[in-house]
UniProtKB/Swiss-Prot annotation:
Main localization category: cytoplasm
Gene: HSP110
Ranges for region Disordered: 501-614, 775-795, 813-886
Name by which UniProt lists this protein: 97 kDa heat shock protein
Subcellular location: Cytoplasm
Family designation: Belongs to the heat shock protein 70 family.
């Protein structure tokens, strides 16, 4: 299972993967870890990444970039209208009111949705990851800006589906950065201690995002988010471009804004100038050749002038920085550090602004370009069952407050706030309604400062609602949830029906099929009925965990009630038992009869609860399943077209490469291996092929190019083989000579009676001698014949044939020469009488050796002088092994 994280930015994208115990950032076919977020369309194929960016000026009308800002947005959105005037391609309105991007593709006018273009970039990133991992990539985690709404997050998930990916989690950019920061920290405070507050600032190409996170060991909690979705590096580029446009108008009387290609070139140069100013405080020069009307332009700007121009933009940088402090009620001294990421965070004036607000130096311990992708890969590893990752809990938050609206039973409208701003996510809440018929819930954002003009999230219809047997409103429990993606949904709905005792007996007799899908609950309901239209019980865990915890609490509460009731009944029963001792048997029987009657009445009045699962019909403005499937099929066709075009271009390039390579070698390396006549005809054919490539053969099929190179190789391969054989044949003949010499020496030793070969029969050695004579004769004849051939003629013998002769000679000679000597015959052991074990078995005394006798003697008590001399004191007894300890 692959563990991959994708950071799809407004300007560029990165891929990170978890493997080898760490996180790696993948490089593409250009050995670059950065892949431009650009897709370009042509008459025959489309290109993504670096190849597409190279066409951003020459094919600007069909080159799409900055598509992230159009996902799930209406064409009438003011921000869409602003961006539509910035991008060089045509932005149109789709029938459903969303944004479409119009290009010329395969000779036809095509309109693509932003989700499709996003999927095309994911397809490119997926292919790059698969090349590096040598396996299929399916599961992934994708980053999105923290300010993305519900619809935009759904759009990213649909884009992943179109690209054939399973998005395990959509994670905010700053949350991914915080995860990449915190999971490796070993000095975080323990859960019981005060958390470490860290600010993360991500200044990218089109937006500024700020987040405050609290860290404890093994835990990350996002406290607050703030952003400016219209403030990024491109705004500083526009500022410079406007400055130089006015300058060129004044000095050169040239309006570069009137020419789209000239404006794009100026924007590219301004981006380079901005980067140079970030690293140098000196005056930076700009020179653009033939920008417009075959005229060159030049300009200069210093960092001080640039910062003066950007004063208004720098003031806007302070707004989200101060906002997170206000939301969290933190002071600058409560902040441990400020981590900055994003390409635009390298601008010195932005760093100074951050320092001024937080009164601390900015920290750059994270990779400013790759931190988001690395955090995505870590999140994917945490979610993957195939990876063991250090326990680390991530608690994100909802960027906007969410409210529910509904129509009451008597026509009045009702509403309530499901989650406030910065509510922790994911979360679930259980809501209770009382209805007689199906009803509809409308979810919308409560924040009026939403980046989208449309605040509605979706409509959710609760189906299958029916009244009680008495005609009253039924109790409906609805669970709403914001999941790990940050997407709101109504996850489940159920109708609680109370059944009397007789209904219970009938239900027990009926089959499950007759009752339908339902489940039984105990007598205690999770929530009591009241006059309020609804009540709620927040569940902070996951959906399953929330239900389980609620059920456990209900069971525990009900169990406690039943236990206390049983105790009361037991005490009453014991009292009645004591009283019954003083009564006669008839009185006891009457008491027992009345007790049984009361028990039957209690059983008759007992009610049970039956739960009916209800269906939910969701209606949102996201892509439908049919649209996603249709786009998936189109993406597959485009991938096949791209592959076919690539194979065709590779075949064409192979023909062109062969023509140039062979034409050069005919006059250099292969000159003496081809006759004058053959060289002339082959050179003419190569020239004709070159002309054909640029004329009639400029756009042919793959098979035509393959046939062309095959016909050329029929002439060129024999020439190349002559050159190859000229260099390999002497080496092969030398190997044959060494083998003949080795076997010849063996024959000499055998004839001299060498003991090493004395076991070999004469007939066998005669076979070796005969084989050597045949190979020597073959070598001499082939060498003589080859010497009579010219270099441009085909060889008499090849190096492969010579090596085959060597192998055949070894096959005959080696088994004979390497034949092992037979082992000498072993004499049977002499009979020296029975062994000690056999003697003991027969009952006789076992013979002992001299050593054994000495050991027996040593075990006996010493006598005489010998015993005195051999006697040792207990303190002087030596151990069996002496060890010297250093």
């Amino acid at each position: 299972m692959s563990v991959v994280g994708f950071d799809v930015g407004n300007l560029s994208s990165y891929i990170a993967v978890a493997r080898g115990g760490g996180i790696e950032t993948m490089a593409n076919e250009y050995s670059d870890r950065l892949t431009p977020s650009v897709v370009s369309f042509g008459e025959k194929s489309r290109t993504q990444g670096h190849a597409a960016r190279s066409q951003a000026i020459t094919n600007y009308k069909n080159t799409l970039s900055q598509f992230k800002r159009f996902i799930a947005r209406q064409f009438s959105d003011p921000s869409v209208q602003k961006d539509a005037h910035v991008v060089p391609y045509k932005v149109t309105q789709l029938p459903n009111g969303n944004v479409g991007m119009q290009v010329q593709y395969l000779g036809e006018t095509e309109t693509f949705t932003p989700e499709q273009i996003y999927a095309m970039i994911l397809t490119k990133l997926k292919a790059t990851a698969e090349v590096n991992l040598c396996r299929k990539v399916v599961d992934c985690v994708i980053s999105v800006p923290q300010y993305y709404t519900d619809l935009e997050r759904r759009g990213v998930i649909h884009a992943a589906e179109i690209a054939g990916l399973n998005c395990l989690r959509v994670i905010s950019d700053t949350t991914a950065v915080a995860l990449a920061y915190g999971i490796y920290k070993q000095d975080l405070p323990t859960p019981e201690e005060k958390p470490r507050n860290v600010v993360f600032v991500d200044c990218g190409h089109s937006s500024l995002q700020v987040s405050v996170c609290a860290f404890n060991k093994g835990k990350l909690k996002v406290l607050a988010n703030a952003s400016d979705k219209n403030l990024g590096g491109r705004d500083f580029d526009w500022l410079l471009a406007e400055h130089f446009a006015v300058d060129f108008q004044t000095r050169y009387k040239m309006d570069v804004k009137s020419n789209q290609r000239a404006w794009l070139r100026l924007m590219a140069e301004c981006d380079k100038t901005k980067k140079l100013m970030s690293a140098n405080a000196t005056v930076i020069s700009m020179n653009i050749e033939c920008i417009m009307n075959d005229r060159d332009v030049s300009g200069k700007i210093s960092r001080a002038d640039f910062e003066a121009l950007a004063a208004e933009l720098l003031k806007r940088v302070e707004v989200p920085l101060k906002s997170v402090l206000e939301q969290t009620k933190l002071k600058p001294e409560d902040i441990h550090s400020i981590e900055i990421v994003g390409g635009s965070s390298r601008i010195p004036s932005i760093k100074e602004t951050i320092k001024k607000v937080f009164k601390k130096e900015c920290s750059t311990t994270l990779n400013q370009d790759e931190a988001v992708a690395r955090g995505c890969a870590l999140q994917c590893a945490i979610l993957s069952p195939t990876f063991r990752v250090r326990d680390f809990t991530v608690t994100d938050l909802t960027p906007y407050p969410i409210e529910l609206e509904w129509k009451g039973t008597e026509g009045e409208d009702g509403s309530m706030e499901v989650s406030h701003k910065n509510h922790q996510a994911p979360f679930s809440k259980m809501l209770t309604f009382y209805r007689k018929e199906p009803f509809e819930l409308v979810a919308r954002y409560a924040d009026t400062n939403l980046p989208l003009p449309e605040r509605r999230i979706g409509r959710f219809k609760i189906n299958g609602v029916f009244p009680t047997a008495e005609g009253e409103s039924s109790k409906i429990k609805v669970k709403v949830r914001v999941d790990g993606h940050g997407i709101f949904k109504v996850s489940s709905a159920s109708l609680i029906e109370k059944l009397p005792a007789q209904a219970e007996d009938a239900m027990e007799d009926s089959s499950p099929e007759e009752n339908g899908p339902s489940k039984e609950e105990g007598s205690g309901a999770s929530q009591s009925e009241n006059d309020a239209p609804m009540d709620q019980s927040p569940v902070e865990g996951g959906a399953g965990e929330g239900e389980a915890s609620a059920d456990k609490e209900e069971q525990a509460e009900n169990g406690a009630k039943e236990t206390s009731k049983d105790k009361d009944q037991t005490s009453e029963g014991s009292k009645s038992d004591k009283e019954s001792k003083d009564q006669n048997s008839e009185g006891s029987k009457s008491d027992n009869g009345s007790t049984e009657t009361d028990a039957k009445a209690t059983k008759k009045n007992k009610k049970t609860i039956k739960t009916h699962e209800l269906t939910i019909t969701a209606s949102t403005d996201e892509l439908s399943i049919a649209e996603v499937n249709n786009f998936f099929e189109k993406e597959g066709k485009m991938i096949a077209q791209d592959r076919l075009e690539k194979e065709k271009n590779d075949a064409k390039n192979a023909v062109e490469e062969y023509v140039y390579d062979m034409r050069e070698k005919l006059c250099d390396k292969f000159e003496q291996y081809v006759s004058e006549k053959e060289r002339g005809s082959f050179s003419k054919l190569l020239e004709e092929t070159e002309n054909w490539l640029y004329e009639d053969g400029e756009d042919e099929t793959k098979s035509v190019y393959q046939a062309k190179i095959t016909s050329l190789k029929k002439i060129g391969d024999p020439i190349e083989n002559r050159y190859k054989e000229k260099h390999e044949r002497p080496v092969a003949f030398e190997e044959l000579g060494k083998a003949l010499m080795l076997y010849g020496k063996t024959l000499d030793l055998y004839s001299q009676g060498d003991e090493k070969y004395s076991h070999i029969e004469k007939d066998e050695m005669a076979k070796v001698e005969k084989c050597l004579k045949e190979k020597e004769a073959w070598r001499d004849s082939k060498t003589s014949a080859q010497n009579q051939k010219a270099a441009y003629q085909d060889p008499v013998v090849t190096a492969q044939q010579i090596r085959s002769e060597i192998q055949s000679m070894k096959f005959i000679c080696d088994p004979i020469i390497n034949k092992p000597k037979p082992k000498p015959k072993e004499e049977p052991p002499k009979d020296n009488g029975p062994t000690p074990a056999e003697a003991a078995k027969d009952g006789g005394p076992a013979p002992t050796t001299e050593g054994e006798e000495k050991m027996d003697t040593g075990d006996q008590a010493p006598t005489g002088e010998a015993s005195k001399e051999g006697e040792t004191k207990p303190d002087e007894t030596k151990p069996d092994v002496e060890m010297e300890l250093d």
